[in-house]
UniProtKB/Swiss-Prot annotation:
Family note: Belongs to the LolB family.
A GO BP annotation: protein transport
The protein's name in its UniProt record: Outer-membrane lipoprotein LolB
Keyword Ubl conjugation in record: no
Membrane topology annotation: Lipid-anchor
Native source organism of the sequence: Serratia proteamaculans (strain 568)
Lipid-carrying residues in chain (N-palmitoyl cysteine): 22
Lipidation (S-diacylglycerol cysteine): 22
Signal peptide region: 1-21
InterPro entries xrefs: LolA/LolB/LppX (IPR029046), OM_lipoprot_LolB (IPR004565)
Main location: membrane
GO cellular component, one term: cell outer membrane
Subcellular location(s) per record: Cell outer membrane
Role: Plays a critical role in the incorporation of lipoproteins in the outer membrane after they are released by the LolA protein.
Length: 207
C-alpha cells in the first residue's frame, strides 16, 4: 500500500521553544586523536550500551517546515527501538516502532502505517528528513558510519561530517552529561543544507 502524505505534527508553537533560548556549553580544548587509547576505551564503553532510554526536546527546522516537540527514545536492543513525539499537552503526535526490518508508525489520528524503511516513512509522512540509522549512534556520541570526526579534550566526539549520497550532514556536540559513566551527549545539533535538527536530552536511563 503506498504511503500517503498526511498532516502530522501540529506540534509545539514557536513561542514555547526552549531550545533556541538556552545557552550551550560546547566541549572545548585541544583536539585529540581518534586513534588514541582513551577514545577507543570510551567508544567501546558506549558501544556496550544495548538498552537505554532518553527524553528531552526536539526541533526540526527548514525553509519549508518547523516542528517542535518533546521526544522519548527507548532502545530495547541493538535492532529494536521506539521514538515517540508528543505535544505540550502530552498527546502523542508520532509513535515510531522499529524492529529489524519492520517499521510501524502511528500518527496523531491513530492511523497506522507499516514499512521496511524508517527514514523513508518519516520523510513521506511528515516531510522531515531525519537520518535515523545514524542518529541512533550520534545520540550516544558515536560516529556511526562517519569517518570524518573530531574529538574534544576529554576524548569525546566534538563534531563529525557524514556524506549520505549527495547530502552532507554535520553534527556538533554542544554539551555532555558528565555524571554518567560513560559520559553521553546532552545537547547536539545536526545540519544538512537548510535543515537543522536540535536535540536536548534531559536525562538518560542506562540498563
Amino acid at each position: 500500500m503506498p504511503i500517503r502524505k498526511v498532516s502530522l505534527l501540529r506540534l509545539i508553537p514557536l513561542a514555547s521553544l526552549v531550545l533556541a533560548a538556552c545557552t550551550t556549553t560546547k566541549p572545548t580544548g585541544p583536539a585529540t586523536s581518534p586513534t588514541s587509547p582513551q577514545w577507543r576505551a570510551h567508544e567501546q564503553a558506549v558501544q556496550q550500551l544495548s538498552q537505554y532510554q532518553t527524553r528531552g526536546s526536539f526541533a526540526y527546522l527548514s525553509d519549508q517546515k518547523k516542528v517542535y516537540a518533546r521526544f522519548f527514545w527507548q532502545q530495547y536492543s541493538p535492532d529494536r527501538y521506539r521514538l515517540l513525539l508528543t505535544n505540550p499537552l502530552g498527546s502523542t503526535e508520532l509513535d515510531l516502532n522499529v524492529q529489524k526490518n519492520v517499521v510501524q508508525l502511528t500518527d496523531n489520528q491513530g492511523k497506522r502505517y507499516v514499512s521496511d524503511n524508517a527514514e523513508e516513512m518519516i520523510r513521506k509522512l511528515t516531510g522531515m528528513a531525519i537520518p535515523l540509522d545514524n542518529l541512533r549512534q550520534w545520540m550516544l556520541g558515536l560516529p556511526g558510519e562517519a569517518s570524518d570526526f573530531k574529538l574534544d579534550d576529554q576524548y569525546r566526539l566534538n563534531s563529525l561530517t557524514y556524506q549520505q549520497g549527495s547530502q552532507t550532514w554535520t553534527v556538533d556536540y554542544q554539551d555532555y552529561n558528565n555524571s554518567l559513566k560513560p559520559q553521553l551527549p546532552s545537547r547536539l545539533e545536526l545540519k544538512q543544507g537548510d535543515q537543522r535538527i536540535k536535540l536536548k536530552m534531559d536525562d538518560w536511563t542506562l540498563k
